[in-house]
C-alpha cells in the first residue's frame, strides 16, 4: 500500500515517521503520496584514476574524496561523474513501513540519476539516506 499525503501526515503525528533536519526544518514538503528530502552537505566523489578494472571485493577508499559544501555554494557535477550524497534529513520509519527514493522528473530531464540501484529503504530504518 502506498501512503497518501493524509496517511503520511497521520503517521508523522503518531511518531511512526520521523524527520529531523540539520537546519531545524522538521516538516518536509509532502506531496500526494511522497515527501521531498534535500541533499546534505557531504558528497563523496571518485577521483579520476588509471585503474581500468574495479574489484567489488576490495576497498578503494584512496579513489574517493569527501567534499563538504557550505549552504548556497554550488556543487558542479560534470557529465559522466558519479557522486554519493546523503540527505540533509535524518529519517525514521516504523517497522511496518518501507520507503523508496526516487528522483524528481525535472532532474531526470537533465540526465541526473538520483540513485543507481539502492532506492529501497528498509522497514525500521533510522538515519540519513545515501
PLM regions and their residue ranges:
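DUTPase catalytic domain/fold
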Residues: 1-130
Amino acid at each position: 500500500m502506498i501512503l497518501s499525503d493524509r496517511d503520511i501526515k497521520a503517521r508523522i503525528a503518531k511518531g511512526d515517521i520521523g524527520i529531523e533536519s540539520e537546519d531545524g526544518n522538521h516538516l518536509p514538503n509532502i506531496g500526494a503520496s511522497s515527501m521531498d528530502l534535500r541533499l546534505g552537505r557531504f558528497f563523496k566523489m571518485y577521483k579520476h584514476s588509471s585503474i581500468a578494472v574495479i574489484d567489488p571485493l576490495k576497498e578503494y577508499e584512496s579513489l574517493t574524496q569527501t567534499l563538504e559544501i557550505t549552504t548556497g555554494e554550488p556543487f558542479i557535477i560534470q557529465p559522466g561523474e558519479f557522486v554519493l550524497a546523503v540527505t540533509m534529513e535524518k529519517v525514521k520509519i516504523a517497522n511496518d513501513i518501507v520507503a523508496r527514493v526516487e528522483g524528481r522528473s525535472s532532474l531526470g530531464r537533465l540526465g541526473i540519476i538520483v540513485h543507481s540501484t539502492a532506492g529501497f529503504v528498509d522497514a525500521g530504518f533510522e538515519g540519513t539516506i545515501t
